[in-house]
Amino acid sequence: MKILITGGCGFIGSNLAIFLKQNIQNAKITSVDNLSRKGSSLNHKILSKKKIKNFKLNISKVTTFKKFQRFDLIIHCAAEPAIEASRNKIDEVFNSNLIGTFNILKKCAKDKSNIIYLSSSRVYAMENLFRLKKGISIKENFNVENYKSIYGFTKLSSELLIKEYSYLHKIKYIINRVALVSGPWQFGKEEQGFVSLWVWRHLNRLKLNYIGFEGKGKQVRDVLHIQDLCELILLQIKKLKKINNKLMNVGGGKKNSLNLLRLTELSRKVSKNKIRIGSIKKTSPYDVPYFVTNNSYVTKLYKWKPKRNLKKIITDLYFWMKPNKNILKKYF
């Protein structure tokens, strides 16, 4: 099987490329990435060692893939992932996330390649999320009509574009609305990948802040281990002939949900370090107080559930970071 992974030097893309090469016999994995994010150059070297080819390519600026062979499957991970970019990098977000998808779909249509798309839980309407009672998890039929951020808009628009191309060109697709994912090889920042950042700061005894919602650290998210996501996508590939043209939520679920206070507690236990944590009351216009994924549909389709709990996620991050501190410090 010939597979193209866009954003293959990103956190999800690189983990996925290595995992699929190890778990699909005779798979030929190709990665494309614009190498614009911190850490992507390091992941590029790792992929090379695993004999996975990566081509430096900005998919939003490419209208043809003449130098590439036909692929059986394209796994579309490439995106500008930071939600805060919706405020000050609108052109970049739009081009990377929507025009990039359009260019990929033209390749799919030409070659009759199937597509697995990594969308986002950010497609859901923020106004409705603010009214949500705690304890309720988000299903696929939750409101997507109201404002959500430019980032969320481009992800939702990409979903709709994929469906149109599927109908017009008979392309099989899977759309995963992925929530918060973490694990080794995530170079976290405050606005994206904060679980990884939390563990890194504890390991190195560096200050953190509880940001937004009065700075109390009580906002809730569910977290999915990167290996659980990779295992799901492997299942989706194996079952694509029978299960296709489906859209589903994918996340850690209620059992893997936590607030920042709990994340601090777990990070302290694993690192055995207590650090100073400040408080910033001002809330980002794109932050929500509560989001937990309902996995019932993806579980029904694939009999899949996350296997790795929060402690496992934190522990795996810590024991990846600790022996590699000197290499990793310039990426955090």
Locations of regions flagged by a protein language model:
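N-terminal Rossmann-like NAD(P)+-binding domain of SDR-like oxidoreductases, especially those catalyzing
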Residues: 1-179
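Short, solvent-exposed loop/turn segments at secondary-structure boundaries
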Residues: 87-89, 185-190, 287-289
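A short beta-to-alpha transition loop/helix N-cap that caps and shapes the active-site region
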Residues: 38-40, 125-127, 185, 258, ...
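NAD(P)-dependent short-chain dehydrogenase/reductase
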Residues: 128-137, 160-237, 263-270
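C-terminal substrate-binding subdomain of Rossmann-fold SDR/epimerase-dehydratase oxidoreductases
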Residues: 15-16, 57, 203-332
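Short, surface-exposed alpha-helical segments at coil->helix boundaries
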Residues: 41-44, 159, 196, 257-261, ...
